[in-house]
Amino acid sequence: FDEIHTLDIIDVNGGDHGKAFATNFNPEINIREVTAPCRHWENGAFRETPAMSMHQSFNCPQEVGTYEIYRMYHEEMESLVKHIPTIRRAQFWMSFSPNYLKHLEVLQNVGMTRIDPVTYNGVEIIPLQFLKAVLPDPGDLGKTTKGKTCIGNVITGVKDGKFKAVYIYNICLLYTSPSPR
């Protein structure tokens, strides 16, 4: 590209770890990212929208499937817009299953995603840190995860004076290896 005008980073996890609710990396960081207001770059400035308020269906290649993706803030936006001066819009999208979103909604409704201290039995705890302690360890999920992930970039811009659009992606096959006998 001579100029990049739009960038959509799309992170789809089509894997299934068999747990009712778990995060694929640090639960405290994951839940804070998902529930935080969304920031995306548009026309020279960051714009803010409510968490999870923008979503769309996305059809991944190579039979990964169609997933609902949600626009959210991810820190790489900061450096990308700084180092790509021609960029007009930059967004980060991530997929979440309806099951994940329902569990997250219930946890928010009962206060378990709070980051301010509460007193329980005379001890101050932070609900989100307590939740992290009782959720499955993300490091253990690989043993039971099956499916595919697809992460990629949809990029538009100009090359040699002509409009150009590409989707560059990577597919990862997740599987559980058989137990040694």
Regions found by a protein language model. Name each.
Residues 2-177, 181:
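C-terminal catalytic/substrate-binding lobe primarily of soluble NAD(P)-dependent oxidoreductases
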